[in-house]
Amino acid sequence: MKKILLISVLSLTAAVMSGADLKEECINFKSSRKTVLHVSVDGLPLKVDWYVDNYVKYPNRPQDQLINVYIPENATKDSPIMFYVNNGGWIANSYPDNTIADGKDYNGTHDKVGVALKEGYVVVSYGCRSRADEPVDGRFLGHSPATMTDTKAAIRYLRYNRKSLPAGDVEKIFITGTSGGGALSTVIAASGNSPDFYPSLYEIGAAGVDLEKDGTYSSKDGCGDNVLGVIGYCPITDLGHACAAYEWLYGDTRRVMYITGEMNYPFIEESDLMSASAALAKQYVEYIDSLGLKDDEGNEITSTNLKDYIAGLMHEEIDRTVSEIGIEQMMKDIEKNSRRGKRINNGWLLFNEEGSYTYDLDKHLYYVAEYTTLKPAPAFSNKGLFVTHMNEDSLFGTDEVPYCPFNEYSWNNDKEDNGVGKDETGMTWDEYMETEEGRALALQIKMTSAIDYLLEGTSDIAPYWYVRHGMDDRDTSFAVEALLFNAIQNNPKVNDSNVGFAWLKPHSGDYDVPEAYSWLKKIL
């Protein structure tokens, strides 16, 4: 067995601290750089003050670990703060220098930036570390929890500087993002002030986190990383179970396409893919049955009725859409919503003359798979198997390795010479997870998942949630989103949950800005 060096996830950034030369005042808003922008909203001129600053004392990626604070002239001390994340694929986290562009005219109804400026909201964006970062001195510092830690540090920066900010209420922070950004937004909203993140926050010099004499970490009052609410789209969350969830939902669809020859992955042996699919689907059954989630009537959600629960959520969105745009337009949507020419309704949604309808989830899944080719199996953790460009494995692992499989199947079947997996450690997934290194990996996985923190319930969970996932979006399993919706709706700390599927939306976000920001305005 090859000997490998493994370290705790909580010390991923420790090595860079000794070389940091930034001083305490680097996270003081008073030292930020200011630029005056002139934009317009619906043709009306508006001045915006743009501030740029460091948000941590010890950055190891200083070109990205920067924060933008945009304050329109109509903002006040009571204005909410819209906190924008990027994080596409857990990769696209570089510092954005054009969240608000000088001279641009914004739409004050359908553009989220335009709405924020029109209403006098403070807009914040930032850059952070990601799994795509090059190693620093041979160490991979972009693994989990780096992205979450940096995001929390940026939020802490705002609270640390509450008295210096010209406008904006730091207790009214709403975080928003799409896809990986949706996942990041939801996990931040679910894990407010969780001690899980204190060590990594301390190591980068985030505001308000101290190391006590007894070796424990603490957070100062008034410098927390909790948020008031979240607007999230298609969150790629619960990664530890996402591969299994994908095959549990799409396994039968995949088998039909395999038999009919409609499934084509030129770089994968289809027999290997189908074997992986079956094994992963079985794992998800065990996971679902262990959660103890309940529906609105108090009935336990299990592997035998979860599809019925998903279908019920789809019915809710179909009913809403019927009342909003009507049956005729919906039928047109079904046939025109295609990337490969005209699509034919395969009977997944059929309306009767009197206006009633029948919905078939299995046919709906096939319809979705015709729209966009299904991800391979495993869908998210497969770098050590047969796919090198469609996975999230580089989000995990110690700083000594470029990536790590993050579920049982991918670990046990890893084939690459990479220092991880059963082939290199000699340990099965279950055996490895009993080790100190395995527990560190489990914590890394947890720190990317809103569901884990919602079910645990010990953090300062955001009280307001607006989350959507498109009915034509196959980038993660409908099961993952259904469980997320359920965990949000049944959490006692959540005051308002506006969650659900979105009529025939693909993998995308911010398609319902008027609705989402109307919801936000009612809360405020």
Regions found by a protein language model. Give the residues of each.
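N-terminal cap/lid segment of alpha/beta-hydrolase-fold proteins
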Residues: 21-77, 436-447, 456
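Hydrophobic h-region of N-terminal signal peptides that target proteins for export
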Residues: 10-18
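Non-catalytic, alpha-helical, charged scaffold/linker segments
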Residues: 216, 232-237, 241-382
